[in-house]
Amino acid sequence: MKLSDFDFDLPSELIAQYPSSKRDHSDLLIAATPPIKTKFYNIIDYLKEGDLLVFNNSKVIKAKLNLEKNRPLSKLAYRDKFEGDMECRTAVYTNVREDSSTGSTYKLPLEVELEKRSNITINLNQRLSNNCWSAFAKPARRLNIGDEFHFDNHKVIIVEKLAIGEIKVKFELDDISVFEFLDKYGEMPLPLYIRHHEAQKSNNERYQNIYSSIEGSVAAPTAGLHFTNDILNKLKAKNIQTTFLTLHVGAGTFLPVKTENIHEHKMHTEYCSITPDTARLINKAKQEKQRIIAVGTTTLRTLESSCNNGTVKACDFETDIFITPGFKFQTADILLTNFHFPKSTLFMLICAFAGFKEMHKLYKYAIKEKMRFFSYGDATLLYRKI
């Protein structure tokens, strides 16, 4: 299939810039015939006793760091004043002139070396070791191997330049962990399409799932943002089971597909973990023909990556699974997810799960109903097409 097969027109005003007033007050679209539009707090009505909901418990870290670097410019002939935020570092005064009207002399700088301050943003991507991470830098061309950036008694060092825009950084910290450092100096890494950043404290809360517990994601597993403690209690009261796995979402989740032949696209790798207890619950539900509901595409990708001949394995691993139409699913019966970008790997995934034509039709309905898209947007409950 071609990349253009997964395109659709999305009005920009439907891209959610803010979360709903309350987590569970977002809209929920049930992929029934015809579609049912309701509120998320009614999701309990579409689940039944014995269902098993599988959540991703990864916690978003403050993975965005703002750096400042003084960038030297070439030596220039410069006769008048210095402009902007440039600072004169050195000046060679080789010509002394006399003011004929006053008789006084003055020095004319013929050659100066200038410096300009550059603002650089890095977004951590994946943990490579205790103190080393891969990251995406913008603009990466302003960074050099060996550059050091100081945060009080701590240092961030550029140790390698990888693919275009990607770097490797090392943290040299004074008696704190990388996560503690990021919590103090970093910012929540909101997607670029969310243009407001003024309410950082609010984003720290709302761009995090209430059940998140294991630090490591640089973007939220957004399907879970709608859940509240009240909904979790109602699930328990209805004898609906819940369990957790981990996939640390990397910054590569926002990278676009650039090849028209979708099978030429290379997925980023992400760390996953499934505990023995979680694997046992999932396999038991499958054996007893109970429905398995994957909360989010990250959960579904982890389940399918770990499944061998219909059995989910307990393991720690990395996955770069790329799910497109034609994929044979072995785990989830239902997928809860937000609305995704045109031509994205996630839209391809839901087309594989619930049907290519069906998803184009459902998204057309959602757009007509002015439902809200992407991270802070509304949710949809999709049923696997057999």
From Swiss-Prot:
Annotated catalysed reactions: 7-aminomethyl-7-carbaguanosine(34) in tRNA + S-adenosyl-L-methionine = epoxyqueuosine(34) in tRNA + adenine + L-methionine + 2 H(+)
Pathway: tRNA modification; tRNA-queuosine biosynthesis
Domain of life: Bacteria
Listed HAMAP family: QueA
Functional note: Transfers and isomerizes the ribose moiety from AdoMet to the 7-aminomethyl group of 7-deazaguanine (preQ1-tRNA) to give epoxyqueuosine (oQ-tRNA).
Similarity-based family: Belongs to the QueA family.
Subunit composition and interactions: Monomer.
Protein name per the record: S-adenosylmethionine:tRNA ribosyltransferase-isomerase
